[in-house]
Amino acid sequence: MTAALATAWGADVVGCMHVPDSPDIFRATCTDLAQQSDVLVTSGGVSAGAFDVVKESLDDMTFTKVAMQPGKPQGFGRFRDTVFLGFPGNPVSCYVSAQLFLRPLLRRMAGADTNHTVVQIPAGSNWRSPLERTQFVPAMIIDGAVIPTHVQAGGSHLVASLAATTALAVAVSYTHLRAH
């Protein structure tokens, strides 16, 4: 999915692969890819779990928690001379992360405007954002109202919801949106 998004945004994707949960193999793969890439993007392995190989293998990168949902765990830095972005493994979290971090990076590298188009549209259904996190909800616009593309506005594993997504609805921390 991330490779397809990057391609749609004008990047030449050099490789897209699954790497075993081995720190040595993962780091060697990153070293090989970094020699032929300007940007290295990973998905999965960036939180605090026992099998977070990305975090273990690239301990010189920054891994942090961002006050956002979905996509709270993130990684970034420079691996060799290559920009590194480490996204969560949940598909919706990865999609949101790519929209917020990879797309502007690629646009900046191409010399294009990095601003997202922002419009205010009434909510077409009710939802609450979590306390202390900005929520980015994959959504669609129907009859002038924004509606989440999945039934529960928050399931980062609901990849099928992305097929209908045409926008990201943004609700700042602790916002209660009511349908109009």
Show the residue positions of the predicted features.
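Short intrinsically disordered, low-complexity coil segments enriched in acidic
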Residues: 1-8, 136, 176-180
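Flexible glycine/proline-rich
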Residues: 57-178
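Short, ordered loop/turn segments at secondary-structure junctions
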Residues: 18-21, 45-46, 66-73
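Glycine-rich beta-strand-to-loop/alpha-helix junction loops that act as flexible
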Residues: 42-54
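Short acidic, glycine/serine/threonine-rich loops at helix termini
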Residues: 26-28, 52-55
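Loop/helix-junction capping segments adjacent to catalytic residues or to phosphate/diphosphate-binding pockets
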Residues: 23-24, 48, 95
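Phosphate-binding glycine-rich loops and their immediate beta-loop-alpha structural context
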Residues: 1-42
